[in-house]
């Protein structure tokens, strides 16, 4: 992974309003691989049943997908995302999403993404497909 691309993505995540709102941190970034983390805050992310809102868990998944899919320095956008919600995290759980590229063609790339809590319990798993535009990321 080019250090210029890595630094640009790290800085973009630090500035991103969505990541700031949910306290998402980028822990690791390598070619086609990303690890992000947030603490599930029930005051921000509960649903009507006082459990984690699926959108909050998906937001963490999307952050891992977004960062892993940009590592070649070009814009990639989501084409398809399939999420299985396996378990609901406990309140204030530290959630970690890890995205790994599993396939790549000239125009697409596939990613497996898993969300676990701090005890290693699987919260959600995801398969995502990105469209690779070939255009450079604008914040380089």
Where would I find each of the regions flagged by the language model?
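A generic structural signal for short beta-strands and their flanking turns/coil linkers
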Residues: 20-22, 32-34, 75-81, 93-95, ...
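Catalytic strand-loop segment that frames the active site of acyl-thioester-processing enzymes
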Residues: 21-51
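Hydrophobic residues in beta-strands and at strand termini
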Residues: 38-40, 85, 132
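Extreme N-terminal tail/first-helix region
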Residues: 1-16
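HotDog/MaoC-like acyl-thioester-processing domains
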Residues: 1-3, 90-96, 100-140
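Compact, glycine-rich, soluble single-domain proteins
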Residues: 48-62, 66
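Hydrophobic beta-strand-centered segment that forms part of the acyl-chain substrate-binding groove
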Residues: 66-96, 101
